[in-house]
């Protein structure tokens, strides 16, 4: 395993999302661009990516160490990987039929704990005992570039594992493949999910205000931001909020930016006009009473409660995982009280990427697991039917969307993929940078006080500039649109 991995990781430990160590400038990974270029990069690498430079042993090991932040990936592996025998009662070890054990190391994503623990383990990877080395790990869209960066060389190129992205992953959505690629287009991870977002809404509130809960008719009420705002006045007149928080719209605006936060080779942050639109619209909506002033962000107790039956919030912009992992657990009423429809704009939120880790002694198992969970159409359809994930198979999601017999019990039998599938087809994403996570977090926290009337606009801007430079000292300027 290459020594420069650890030099870069030491720098990343100091600035979690930045990849600027060892005198090198931060790289970026393209999330859009030519599929042909990506295919050529993956094809060319088949000969040049030597697996032996990524593995620590010529013989397959007996312990597969996987780092993740919850049990989501484990349950998907258990559901579709044909070598699974059983998992221990505490969920820490999955036993395979060939005698190999999967050891799960789980740390929470909140406050960067997962990344910190993963980075610490990666810095010890070269000296770790064979059965203690990380074999696989997961990353999220906000920080995937940190691990797919070609210079860091942490995530093993799929071609080195014997996976051909063009042939083996040809049915995946293109934006998921390119998000998991380095700047040259070499794919270094794969995901079982795509994450288009819809508008999930309360049927009872829809009937009370609009006289119908029909998804197509409700879509007409939220077809674009201006229409949604006008409908919000109708909701407010009856004592309801359109959305819970200004944070609920951030991903729609933030994932639709035209240019990266930080261009490749630059040390300047460029705030996209879409971010300014989010700031202006959020302030306007909050002041107009369309949002709940008591809900100051996502993942808080107030936000969770706003999804309960006593809440006056009409709806939420959520991907499939948001319905299954967030909305459903927070709802204390009966099934069938929620429905989904197209929101004011199509966008992607999230994605869990699976990587083989440089230094593994289990490359064959790593390959098998990646293919089983992210590339096998039948397996992906099973995951969709069992967990309501919108899985990464274009043909499979088209089949599900057109299947009149498919329905989600939580949504009263509605088939949400009728709306998810076309939304996924229209998603484009701009280039990712190693600074995305920090920018996303700090722009929201810095302007929250402005939305709440505690500071003025210029102070909020100054607070963001100060906070972003404290997190990333190498940033030299923050450029705001005119």
Task: Indicate where each model-derived feature is located.
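Extracytoplasmic ligand-binding clamshell segments of periplasmic binding protein
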Residues: 113-117, 121, 240, 245-248, ...
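C-terminal motif of bacterial Sec signal peptides marking the signal peptidase cleavage site
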Residues: 17-21
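Conserved N-terminal structural module of periplasmic/extracytoplasmic solute-binding proteins
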Residues: 7-8, 22-145, 365, 455-482
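Short helices/loops that flank or line small-molecule/ion binding pockets
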Residues: 115-133, 137, 149-150, 206, ...
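Helix-loop-helix "hinge/cap" segment bordering the ligand-binding cleft or interdomain interface
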Residues: 159-170, 178-249, 262-296, 358-364, ...
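Extracytoplasmic/periplasmic substrate-recognition and gating elements
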Residues: 62, 98, 123, 185, ...
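Long, aromatic- and glycine/proline-rich binding clefts that accommodate carbohydrate-like moieties
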Residues: 384-449, 477-482
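Hinge/lid segment of periplasmic solute-binding proteins
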Residues: 40-55, 112, 126, 130, ...
